[in-house]
């Protein structure tokens, strides 16, 4: 089951992508399939098979995005900073310099940019905690602990 948590920015991005697929990519791909179908023998027509595959891929992408948008739960800006919640920036310390993470839904996760999912091991350990609390978890088979120093 896909995580439904999305920011309004991600919803806007998905709506734009769906619009491009519906109004540009799909009609163009469908026209290419029609053009190649007119050439006759489908079994020997590699271009036709590739065009059909591309059209199936576009249709699949459209269905996925439509499903994501239909089931989306918008991450509302949270002005309460007592406890860690989805949408918060959380600064933690442990084993080196402080690190700040933004906790979002799994569709928007970019760990290399400090964006983690609320269902990731670290994200789920942080949810509901307060400044000053320590979370302990196992990462790559190793016990680690982090102290929460700031919630924004």
Residue ranges and their predicted role:
Residues 1, 16, 31, 37, ...:
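Residue-level signal for pocket-adjacent positions within structured domains
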Residues 1-57:
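N-terminal cationic and glycine-rich segments that engage phosphates or anionic surfaces
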Residues 6-11, 63-65, 99-100:
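Short amphipathic alpha-helical segments, especially helix-boundary/capping motifs
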Residues 21-24, 36-39, 65-72, 129:
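Conserved, well-folded catalytic cores of nucleic-acid-processing
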Residues 46, 50, 55-78, 82:
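Internal alpha/beta loop-helix hairpins
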Residues 75-152:
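Non-DNA-binding regulatory cores of transcription-related proteins
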